Design a protein with these regions (language model features):
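Catalytic Walker B motif of ABC-type/P-loop ATPase nucleotide-binding domains
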Residues: 152-156
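Hydrophobic anchor residue at the start of the ABC signature
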Residues: 141
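Helix N-cap at the start of a conserved alpha-helix in ABC-type nucleotide-binding domains
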Residues: 163-165
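Conserved ABC ATPase "signature" region
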Residues: 105-123
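H-loop/switch region of ABC-family ATPase nucleotide-binding domains
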Residues: 187-188
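H-loop (His-switch) and adjacent beta-strand-loop-beta switch element
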Residues: 197-214
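Conserved ABC ATPase signature
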Residues: 127-131, 135
Length: 242
């Protein structure tokens, strides 16, 4: 479990969010939503330990930070770096083998299985600079699979990629969730949140709403001039424009 106690997220002494209180339950699948500049990506970076909180605390149950995998937005990645697909995926083995530890037979099997899971097994020797956006995202998800992390942080993982890849990666996310991983994703597509994410954290300049996705989205749609009704599946909400 990740606990946030009066935590303000931002840069330096400048907070992007009011104090946040709540927790990400172990094994949960949570979407972070909010307007541009609300602090969504900054929150992920703070959870990943890449920058400190402006105020308050972030603590982990048992006092130990779990093994985590962080996937930033594609715009933050250097696609010109001369590396091939299988070597990118092999980076997921580093937490176990170390940077200079080499890839053993067991790790090689994990890499091949991960590439197969995302449909990229035939492009293992392809330079990443020659991949489409969707293909690159599949490779990065394969690296996540190899990492075997308990905490997975995804920053806009479906932006700018084709619908077939989106569907495949959602299957990967659901499989990881079934295995008990804790997954936190920044998303902009409310229909995707409604259909696939049981929990949501909505960040606004005035505060935050952190409940089940159903409860959060009722408030989100209300604030945007729409309302929600339950579909035939109790856990799914649909927006009805007024």
């Amino acid at each position: 479990m990740i606990n946030m106690n009066n935590t303000e997220i931002g840069y330096g002494n400048h907070a992007l969010t009011p104090p946040i209180d709540g927790c990400f339950v172990a094994g949960s699948l949570t979407a972070i939503i909010g307007a541009n500049g609300a602090g969504k990506s900054t929150l992920l970076k703070t959870l990943a330990g890449l920058q400190p909180a402006v105020a308050g605390q972030i603590t982990f149950t048992g006092g130990r930070v779990p093994q985590m995998a962080y996937l930033p937005q594609q715009a933050e990645l250097d696609r010109q770096f001369p590396i091939v697909v299988q070597d990118v995926v092999a980076m997921g083995c580093w937490p176990q083998s170390g940077l200079l530890g080499g890839i053993n037979h067991q790790s090689r099997q994990r890499i091949n299985q991960a590439l197969s899971a995302v449909g990229m097994q035939d492009m293992a020797r392809q330079p990443v600079g020659e991949l489409s956006g969707g293909q690159l995202q599949r490779v990065l998800f394969a690296r996540l699979l190899v990492q075997q992390a308990q905490l997975i942080l995804l920053d806009e993982p479906f932006t700018g990629i084709d619908s077939q890849t989106v569907g495949l990666l959602l299957e990967v996310i659901h499989q990881l969730h079934t295995e008990g991983r804790t997954i936190i994703a920044v998303l902009h597509d409310m229909s995707m949140v409604e259909e696939h994410f049981p929990h949501a954290l909505w960040l606004t300049p005035q505060g935050h709403c952190w409940q089940s996705a159903e409860q959060v989205l009722v408030q989100w749609h209300h604030s945007h001039g729409s309302s929600c009704s339950f579909s035939s599946r109790p856990s799914i909400l649909r927006a009805i424009n007024l």
